[in-house]
Amino acid sequence: MSKGPAPFLNIGKRAKDLLYKDYNFDQKFSLTTTSNSGLGLTATGVKIDELFIGDIQTQHKSGKTTVDVKIDSESRVSTTVTVDEALTGLKTSFSFRVPDQKSGKLDLQYLHDHFALNSTIGLTSTPLIELAATIGTNELSAGAEVGFDSTSASVTKYNSGICYNKHDFSAAVLLADKGETLKASYIHTFNETNGATVAAEVTHKLKTKENYFTIGSSHAIDSSTLLKTRFSNGGKVGVLCQHEWRPKSTVSISAEYDPKVVSSPSRFGVAIALKP
C-alpha cells in the first residue's frame, strides 16, 4: 500500500464499490483477449430493453505508455494515451473523441508521500478545468475538488471530504453538490476468511432536510462465488450473485425490487465476462 493519501476521487470508494459496483439490470456480455506483445482486445455488448449497444476496445502497452482506442456502435472513436511515471509519481493522459472536436482533455495525477494532486484541463480555447487535492497519509487524509468553466467564468462544482482507512475498515465524510449534500459512509470487514463485509452510506440534503440511506453486505459463499445484498430507504432491495466459473471469467446475476415503482417493481440483469 502507498504511504501517501489516495486521490480525492477515492474518498469513500471502498463503501461505494460494495454498495453499487457490479450491479447490472440489463443483459451484458464482454469478451477480453490479450497477447504476449501487450495488445488487448475487449468486445462488449449491452441489451437495454429493446436497444442494443456495444463497443470494441483495444489496448496496447509498451514500456510506460498505454494506448486505448474504443469504437462504439454509433461509430464514435475514443482514444486515450497514458504515460505512467514519466517523472516519479506523475501520470499523464491525453484523450479525445472523434468526431467531437471539443472532447480533447489532458489529465495529470501526481502522487507524493504526503499529498495527491489531480487536474483535468479541456483542450479548447475556453476549457473546463478541474482540480483536486488530498493531504495526509494512506490512513488519514482530507481533500477538496473544484471545477471551473472558463466560458461562463463560473464554478461548476466544489466538494470536500475526509477519510480514515485501515486494512479492515474505512470511514469517510463528504460535503458535495456545492455544499448542499452531506454524505457519510462506512465499510467493515468482519471475517477475512470469507470476506464477510458490511457497508453503509447515509445522505443528508441540507436545504430540503431529506435523508437517504443504503446498507449492504458482501461475503464469499465459496472460493468462486460472491454474494452481495443491499437495502435502501423506501424498501428497495437488491441482490447480486457473481460466480467465477473459470479463472477471470464470471457470470453475474442481479435482482432488485422497488415497491415504489408500481408498474414494474422488479428488475433483473445478467452480465457475462469471458477472458480466455
Swiss-Prot record:
Molecular functions (GO terms): porin activity; voltage-gated monoatomic anion channel activity
Pfam families: Porin_3 (PF01459)
Name of the protein in its database record: Mitochondrial outer membrane protein porin 6
Keywords, in A-Z order: Ion transport, Membrane, Mitochondrion, Mitochondrion outer membrane, Porin, Transmembrane, Transmembrane beta strand, Transport
Organism whose genome encodes this protein: Oryza sativa subsp. japonica
One CC-aspect GO term: pore complex
Family statement drawn from the similarity comment of this UniProt entry: Belongs to the eukaryotic mitochondrial porin (TC 1.B.8.1) family.
GO biological process: response to bacterium
Entry annotated with the keyword Cytoplasm: no
Annotated compartments: Mitochondrion outer membrane
Domain notes per entry: Consists mainly of membrane-spanning sided beta-sheets.
Function as written in the Swiss-Prot or TrEMBL entry: Forms a channel through the mitochondrial outer membrane that allows diffusion of small hydrophilic molecules. The channel adopts an open conformation at low or zero membrane potential and a closed conformation at potentials above 30-40 mV. The open state has a weak anion selectivity whereas the closed state is cation-selective.
